[in-house]
Amino acid sequence: MAKDVPPPDVNGKTVLLKPNILSPKKPEFAICTHPVVVGAAVKLFLELGAKKVLVGESPATANPTSAAKATGMYNQIIDNGGEWVEFSDQIVVECPEGKLVKSFEFASPFADADIIVSLSKLKTHQFMSYTGAMKN
């Protein structure tokens, strides 16, 4: 596939991976992005020359770091050379030309990244057939 779809140029850049951690459940429950997928993505982007690979999430129902550890994701990130970040610090991005919204609040790691990659979990939803990356 790499020959058909060339990888992005990440050389010397900071990459932020955004997996989906719904709750602190082990991989066999298939609730979160599989930790092996996250670890492989960290490894791949570093092999492609990324300066740094950050991985972060902000689950609504659990402490982010505890949830990442419970899913096995945290160890995969660290073991493959990545860095876990929490989305606790916020920044405000001003949009003075906006018609309805004049500013947006984002987790600061998004501003620290040159490239953002969504590693969403394919799953169903009570109001949708499937969510894909819609909620990530």
Across the structure, where does each feature detected by a protein language model lie?
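N-terminal and secondary-structure boundary signal
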Residues: M1-N136
